[in-house]
Amino acid sequence: MTVTVKMLVDKLKLKVVYGNEELLAKAITTADISRPGLEMTGYFDYYSPERLQLVGMKEWSYLKTMTANNRYSVFANIFREETPAVVVARGLEIPEEMLQAAKENGVAVLQGRNSTSSLSGDMSWYLNSQLAERTSVHGVLVDIYGMGVLIQGDSGIGKSETALELVKRGHRLVADDRVDVYAKDEGTLWGEPAEILLHLLEIRGVGIIDVMSLYGASAVRDSSQVQLCICLEHFENDEVFDRLGNSNEEIELQGVKIPRIRIPVKTGRNVSVVIEAAAMNYRAKQMGYDATKTFKDRLTDLISKNGED
């Protein structure tokens, strides 16, 4: 996905101090952010001009100790053709020499009101999510009690209908039919809908419904972490399904492994309630309570008592 300076400005509500339409259309190609403190001393080895340049209180205070000519020289070296923009935090005053060098080198100058660390975190979070490599998977992503559950299965098995029932039970739809997943950082998988399918759900026999319009803003999310995969499968008499919770199946997406639970589907079974219970049970395991282990311990105690008798 291409991220432009204008998109960053709109997302983080930054003020454009200098920058025309052409400069704001510049692409940001990396999520890494540079604080050019060392470069201000004249050391440019390993300098990465393609990064966003962030000026905070430390850099600003150091600039105040320099002469006007030295400040201009510093920014003339920092600003390159490939530099997307410079962001000044805390609403600090923009030095005239910075503006002059920015105009001469074609670099947008932006200003944020937040602290330097807060602004850096916000920019990194946004850029990492937008620039991450994406994979599209077939399924439905639903936020169940704050946990992202990816529901997969054969076409026509009832994924969308199940998602609708979960929404009616107070949970939130993230994506239907196509889920774009990406690793925001190591070990963390996120999913979001394709823009054209945002907040929409397809129900066979009914058509396309707008979940946000029908059920309100509390029934949808624009993105969610993916923590659990539920695979719906047609019930077959000769098929063996886990009945004790011993299964440790996983699927791997974008290099991140998440647990997978296979749930048989047959007429009369309330799949949405089963998925809800599976999600709560998984969360309980994450918190240290394992119902399967409790059952095994009770069974072991019972066998021991019977043996003594």
UniProtKB/Swiss-Prot annotation:
Instruction: List the active site.
Output: 138, 159, 177, 243
**Residue numbers binding Mg(2+):** 160, 202
Q: Does the keyword Phosphoprotein apply?
A: no
Q: EC no.? A: 2.7.11.-, 2.7.4.-
Q: Where does ATP bind?
A: 153-160
Q: Which residue ranges are recorded for the region named Important for the catalytic mechanism of dephosphorylation?
A: 264-269
- What is any one GO biological process for this UniProt entry? regulation of carbohydrate metabolic process
Annotated spans, Important for the catalytic mechanism of both phosphorylation and dephosphorylation: 201-210
Give the keywords, sorted: ATP-binding, Carbohydrate metabolism, Kinase, Magnesium, Metal-binding, Multifunctional enzyme, Nucleotide-binding, Serine/threonine-protein kinase, Transferase
Instruction: Give, as one word, the top-level EC class.
Output: transferase
Family, per the entry? Answer: Belongs to the HPrK/P family.
Comment on protein domains: The Walker A ATP-binding motif also binds Pi and PPi.
Any further remark recorded for this protein:
Both phosphorylation and phosphorolysis are carried out by the same active site and suggest a common mechanism for both reactions.
| Its job | Catalyzes the ATP- as well as the pyrophosphate-dependent phosphorylation of a specific serine residue in HPr, a phosphocarrier protein of the phosphoenolpyruvate-dependent sugar phosphotransferase system (PTS). HprK/P also catalyzes the pyrophosphate-producing, inorganic phosphate-dependent dephosphorylation (phosphorolysis) of seryl-phosphorylated HPr (P-Ser-HPr).
Q: How does it assemble?
A: Homohexamer.
Sorted alphabetically, which NCBIfam families does this protein's record hold? hpr-ser
What this protein is called in its record is HPr kinase/phosphorylase
